[in-house]
Amino acid sequence: MMILKMKKEDLPAFLESAKQWGELWGPTTKEEQTAYSKVDGLSQMDLKATRTMIPPKKFLYPPRFTMFDFDEEGFVERTGDVPKRILFGLHPCDIHGILIMDKLFLETYKDPYYAERREKTLLLGHSCIPDDKCMCFATNTDFVAEGFDLFFTDLKMFYLVWVGSSRGHDLVRMRADLFSRNLDKNDILNYTEYRKWKTAQFKAKIDLTGMPDIFELGYNSPVWDELAEKCLSCGQCSMVCPTCNCYNVVDEVELGTVEGTRDRFWDSCMFREYSVVAGGHNFRDKRADRLRLWYTHKLQAFIGEFGKPACVGCGRCVSTCPVDINVATVSKALKEQEVGK
C-alpha cells in the first residue's frame, strides 16, 4: 500500500478535483447533530465531529428503497439510477463496519443492490479523536488498513495519505502535484507519536476479552430479564449500528390496480413483530429474548463465524439508547452478573 504526504492547505483543491468523479458528501453539524450531507467543499464539513447520527452504511444499504416495479406483464428492476458519490471523512470504525457489510452482502450470495451502490461509492477516510463513548480500542477497530480508497491521517501541519485501491490512485493522479512520496524520519516519528497519543485519548474502559464464553455461560442469566425491564424495544440501537443489516420486504400496490413496487426497508430483531410467523406464533415474544439475541449476535455468534465481533466500537448505541443499554453496560453486567443502576 502506498503512503503519500500532502499539505493540509491543499486538501480543498484536491476535493474540488475529486468532484469530477461524483457527488461529494461529508460530515456536517447542525444543532449539535452530525450527519453526512452533500457539500460543495471542505469548508462545509465538520471534521472534528466524533460520529454521525446514522453510519455511512445508509449510502450502501438505504433505510428504504424500491427493488423493482411490477404490473400484470412482469417486473422491471430499479438499477442504474444510483449516483456516483465520494464519502469523505469516514472514521476507522465506520470503515470496519462497511467491511463487515461487504462480507455479508458481497460474499457467498452477492446482493445486486448493495453491490451497485458499493461500486458507485468512493470511501475517503479521515483520522478522528475519541470521546468518552468510543469503544473502538476494545474492538481493535481504532485503526484501519483496508476497505477504503484513500485514508487521510491528520498530523497537524500535513496529512499522511494511505492509498487503498486503484480508484484511490486515480483520484491522486488527478492532482498528483499536491502529493509527495518523499517521507523522512520525522514523518515516521510524527506518525508513531500520533498513534500513541490517540490510544491515550480513550476514556471508555471496556474489556471484551472472553465474551463468547461469557455469553455462553450467561445464556440463562437473570441479567437478561433485568435489562429487559429497562429496554423500550425501540430499535434505536439497530438503526444507528454500522453493522445491523436486517431488513423486510413489502409490496406496495396501487388500489384498484395490479401495479406496484417491491420495497426493502430496515428492520430490527429488537421489534416484537420481527419474529412473528404464520399463524401468529412469535419465537421471541419476550423482550429479554430479543435483547439477548441482539447482543449474542454482536459479541458471540459473529466472533464464532468470522473471528471478530460485529461491534466496531463507534459508540452510537451509547449515545442513542435512552435507558443506557449498550455494548459497554451489557458486557459489564454479564461479567459481574449485576445490572448497573
Model-derived regions, located:
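Iron-sulfur-associated redox domains of electron-transfer enzymes in respiratory
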Residues: 1-214
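Short, well-structured alpha-helical interface segments that form or flank functional binding sites
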Residues: 88, 222, 226-232, 236-239
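Histidine- and/or cysteine-centered catalytic micro-motif in compact active-site loops
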Residues: 166, 236, 242-249, 274
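Oxyanion-binding "anion nests"
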Residues: 206-214, 231-242
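Ferredoxin-type iron-sulfur electron-transfer modules in oxidoreductases and energy-metabolism complexes
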Residues: 208-229, 247-341
